[in-house]
Amino acid sequence: MSTELFSSTREEGSSGSGPSFRSNQRKMLNLLLERDTSFTVCPDVPRTPVGKFLGDSANLSILSGGTPKRCLDLSNLSSGEITATQLTTSADLDETGHLDSSGLQEVHLAGMNHDQHLMKCSPAQLLCSTPNGLDRGHRKRDAMCSSSANKENDNGNLVDSEMKYLGSPITTVPKLDKNPNLGEDQAEEISDELMEFSLKDQEAKVSRSGLYRSPSMPENLNRPRLKQVEKFKDNTIPDKVKKKYFSGQGKLRKGLCLKKTVSLCDITITQMLEEDSNQGHLIGDFSKVCALPTVSGKHQDLKYVNPETVAALLSGKFQGLIEKFYVIDCRYPYEYLGGHIQGALNLYSQEELFNFFLKKPIVPLDTQKRIIIVFHCEFSSERGPRMCRCLREEDRSLNQYPALYYPELYILKGGYRDFFPEYMELCEPQSYCPMHHQDHKTELLRCRSQSKVQEGERQLREQIALLVKDMSP
């Protein structure tokens, strides 16, 4: 029976160009199943012939054979197929006429490899795969086609490489024809998808590289251009209306951005600034606001008034607030005699100043009215401010802080030099004698030496007073 089986398969394999491997395998297995009565088939689940054959291999007696008696004949693998005759000659039968176990294993491996190659090269799987997978499939198919075409030239080398690649000693991959159903439209769609993927990758690379571009390097001129937004034909909104709308919206946004709410911190800061400004307008004992309008001057700790205010004071415009005022001319006697403000007192030394104001302090009869003292010299830069500070310091020492005998002290800004040209009629005599006059050089030296002695005596008295305070318990 076995001889008839293999002779029939040999005749069928030799006739024509030869059927495929799977048809020959099925015929051979069906004949074996008819011969072997001990082979049982499960009718519940349909299986392939190879699966049936291997599933019940434990019950087969034909699998307990020896090794093959002859080597495989692989000379006919260049055609891409193998016939049943070549299979029977390569896998010998034992004495009982059954196939050897090694032959059956080779048949199983050949069937598995053939099924895998058919699944890999199916058109449906190629169409459903990604572009990268499609590209790899094309490369594998081209490689297999080129290898099958060159088998006729180099038989031995290509057989080894083909067997290593396929993992089977029997079967080879047949050359697959191109899918006839794959039309030009599908090919164009695949190429368009590949182009879109490549463009996206290029844009991502350009955007990432732009972050690390050096400022000194020139810009890349080969950057992809941005797509211009095409205007729709159905859009009937005029451009002027659009410009007006967006301009109005931009102004509204700017107004909202510039608006700032007042916080608690801002309120406290403004209150502190107002208090500081108000304190600058308060008198020395911080009880009232200054009666005369003040201006900024050279010394920030002193209050300055302009010539117009002094002229208004002399004309009696502040009688409702002021009971009595004094204009102290701190210049030397020859300057005072050369021209001075009406009613001004010439007190150029500290001793004279203290004796006039502090030996017997002047107190206003009306508590609601005030006593004002205005100091000046030629420019009101040194002598006038110095005498004003001396009187304030001595007044502080005689009273308990913040009480003062004379809380309102002012400096005439610009001195007699600025007052005389504007208000000459308020001067007696109507003339002006500068300090460095050529006719009064000796008097200038005498007055300076006298003032220096007085200044030294004053500093000595202050030091003695400090020592007495330190020694007292």
UniProtKB/Swiss-Prot annotation:
A single MF term (Gene Ontology): phosphoprotein phosphatase activity
Annotated catalysed reactions: O-phospho-L-tyrosyl-[protein] + H2O = L-tyrosyl-[protein] + phosphate
One annotated GO biological process: positive regulation of G2/M transition of mitotic cell cycle
SMART domains per the UniProt record, alphabetical: RHOD
Span list, region Disordered: 1-23, 132-158
CDD domains from the UniProt entry: Cdc25
Name of this chain's protein: M-phase inducer phosphatase 3
Source organism of this protein record: Homo sapiens (Human)
Taxonomic classification: Eukaryota, Metazoa, Chordata, Craniata, Vertebrata
Name of the gene encoding the protein in the UniProt record: CDC25C
